[in-house]
Amino acid sequence: MLQADAGLATQLIQKPKLHNSGIFHWIYVGDTALHLAAAGYRVEIVRLLLASGADPNAARNHRKSAPLHYAADGFITGPAWDAKRQVATLRCLIEKGGDVHRADMNGATPLHRAVRTRCAAAVEFLLKAGGDPVARNKSGSTPFHLAVQNTGRGGSGEPAAIEAQREIIRTFLSLGISPKLKDGAGKSVMGCARSMWIREMLVA
């Protein structure tokens, strides 16, 4: 289909809101086919679209989210979850020019969004790819601050999500990032931690 009409690679989605049961992500007006493929971790389609001229940094939807943001999102307790495919999709986008530092309308980078949705493997990969662990979103939170809070995303409270949260916190600590790190309001990572098990991890 792309060989017959290369313009499909850059065509914008027109429906106000689209939800596909096989892809656990909302798609909005202004998104491209690459957003849809990235959200579903369809790495083979991502490669094909990029080779056909799709822009890895396109962000014309109302949330100013690029395909890399969608690939960084996840629902780890959902039926379509696949951590390996997620990382492969992120790698493909970054290798073709996806900006790991790009912020959406809320100031969230792909790393913020991977942390928020408890995608531990994606967090580790994005950090290795140059993601900034101390970048602040518009609320002033760094990815490390989000790691110690209940974000209401990624199956929060479920055993798999809690274990992923532990892994993410360990990853930040292994990089030597201090729990004393302040957010935009001057609050430390430790000060944002409410659960005792998280506080114990931060002081260990």
What is each residue range found by the language model?
Residues 2-8, 14-16, 47-55, 91-99, ...:
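Ankyrin repeat domain, specifically the short helix-to-loop turn at the C-terminus of the second helix
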Residues 11-33, 59-77, 103-109, 136-152, ...:
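Ankyrin-repeat boundary/"N-cap" motif
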Residues 44-45, 85-89, 121-122, 167-168, ...:
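Conserved ankyrin/ankyrin-like repeat signature
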Residues 86, 99-139:
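Eukaryotic tandem repeat interaction scaffolds
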Residues 121-124, 128, 132-185:
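Ankyrin-repeat and related helical/solenoid repeat scaffolds used for protein-protein interactions
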Residues 173, 178-204:
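Leucine-rich solenoid repeat scaffolds
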